[in-house]
Amino acid sequence: VEAALTQPEAIRTPTGSSFEDAAASDRPLIIVVDDDPDICDALYELLRSVDLDAVRFGSTQELLRAPLPDRPGCFILDVRMPGLSGLELQSRLAGKGDGKPIIFLTGYGDVPMTVQAMKAGAVDFLIKPVRDQALLDAVAAAIDVDRGRRASAAVAARAIEQFDALTRREQQVLRAAAAGMLNKQIAFELGISEVTVKLHRGSMMKKIGARTIADLVRAWESLPAPVRDRVAI
């Protein structure tokens, strides 16, 4: 595989802007990894032909060494490659916290491998040779999945930020209120007066921007389970 396949210059926006300019973009970036240079080139050119930004690599090791911008998008990975396989790369990316959707390509109808990949979070598993439209449809679906994932992550991050700004008692009141408990029930559970509960509740609602019980429930449910589990009544 030619070294040029691993260079950042492989990424281009329609206006021909640089990799650094593209890094700040919200445009999807499709990352192609295939040890066959002809296939790698063909996939790259197909993506560029429909106005998608793309970068290509000849091996999983080259991808892991490359500094890539944090942009929505997906991976297109060949399953069987020398060294680190596509499935092993999937595990490595998950360990690094990279949740971009993965589309796997394979020349084999390997059902167990397909099941393993899909269970680990792959969004599609296509058999080579892949029809252009089938691949583009899979990429479009993967981009939608990633945009949804990123939006959910942003909501969760904001919820955690607001939650961490609450006092311990306010966090307890939030959990209880989101569970449907009345002020007097919360007061009994926490061993404090109902007036104190109302004060904590008012302060908590102001901090998280909640006006109704529905807002409280949404704020609580938007928190990741490990964060919710930290709060005991």
PLM region spans:
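C-terminal output helix
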Residues: V1-E2, D110-P112, L126, V130-V139, ...
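Non-catalytic signal-transmission and effector/linker regions of two-component phosphorelay proteins
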Residues: V1-I31, P37, Y44, R158, ...
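Conserved acidic segment of CheY-like receiver
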Residues: D26-I39, L43-L47, T60, F75-I76, ...
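Acidic catalytic/metal-coordinating carboxylates
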Residues: G58-S59, L84-S91, T106-G109
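Receiver (REC) domain active-site loop signature in two-component systems and cognate sites
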Residues: M81
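Recognition helix of helix-turn-helix DNA-binding domains
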Residues: L182-D215
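Basic, Lys/Arg-enriched C-terminal extension of HTH/homeodomain DNA-binding domains
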Residues: M205-I233
